[in-house]
Every structure is written in structure tokens, then in C-alpha cells.
Amino acid sequence: DVPRAASDNTFATASRINMGDTLNGSITETKDYNNYQFQLDSAGCITLNMTAYMRYYCIRIYETDGTEIWYTDSNEWNETVGYRRDEYNIYLEKGTYYIQINGYRREDYDKVTGEYTCRTSFTSSGVTNREDDNSFADANNITIGDKIVGQISVNDDFDTYKFTLSQV
């Protein structure tokens, strides 16, 4: 379990976490957001296993400049059950990110309160390409026959490669 910072409502005061940590939190009348900062040393897939004991919730992922790159919303529970479980697999590039968990519906910003548990994990993609390779000018040089491992992520739409043929 990760102890949350007393005031983690901003990115500057976000609780630092590692993939593999379990996040236990609550959204209250006076605490709208819980922000967590994490770092990936390589490109890969983060998995978020969310169990929410509130009528609905929203998870957002941001880059360090504040750009939102992924979100989930419309996660409304079955009132008879009293909770909702979801699993998300999000492919990201190497870097530092913020996860924000809140009790707002994205489309109308109605707020609810409640508890949640979010288990995190990470699987490296083992990419062999060099980033930034999103243009012809920055393309990765390859040789015919090379094994290439790349990844298309929520924050990286392209991997570009170039090669030369010596015979026609």
C-alpha cells in the first residue's frame, strides 16, 4: 500500500509511486482528486486494476507538462453490487507520468464520494527502436533481416524506419 501525501490534489504534491504498488484512496467532499506520480524506465504497458466503491469514477493519465494523454469515464457501478471492477492496459513510452483518480463523470462533472483500490503493474515491451523516430528525418536505420521490436503508445503514434537496398 502506498501512503498518500496529505495534500495530493496537485501534480506538485502528487504521491510518488512505483508500478506494482496498490493505491488505496478516497474521494471526499473536500478532496476532489488524488494524484500519483510514476516513472517508467522503458516503454511498455501499465495495467490498472481498479475496484471503486463509489457510484462512478474517472482515471486520467497526464504527461509532466500537464497534457492529458488517456482517460476513462462513464464507469458507473451496478447499485445492487455496490462496487465496480475494471482493468485497463495502457501502453506508454519511457518517461514520467501522473495518474489522477477522481469522483467526477467526465461529461458533466457531477461529483460523488467513496473509496477505491487500484493495483498497478508494468510489463516492458522490450523495444529496440530509438525515440524520437516519428518523422522520416529521425527514422531508425535498419538492415533487411533485422528483428525490430517497437511499440505504438497512447503518447507515440509512429515508429519510422529506413533501409537501403544494395541490389535492384
Give residue ranges: language-model regions.
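Short consensus segments that form the blades of beta-propeller domains
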Residues: 49-50, 109
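Surface-exposed beta-strand/loop patches in noncatalytic accessory domains
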Residues: 25-27, 54-84, 104-107, 151
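A cross-taxa feature marking solvent-exposed loop/turn segments within ectodomains of secreted
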Residues: 31, 54-55, 111, 156
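Exposed beta-strand and adjacent loop surfaces of beta-rich binding modules
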Residues: 45, 56-58, 115-117
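Non-catalytic, beta-strand-enriched accessory regions in extracellular/secretory proteins
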Residues: 19-47, 83-88, 98, 146-168
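A generic beta-sheet turn/junction motif
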Residues: 52-54, 92-94, 167
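C-terminal edge strands of extracellular/lumenal beta-sandwich accessory domains
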Residues: 1-17, 34-36, 61-68, 88, ...
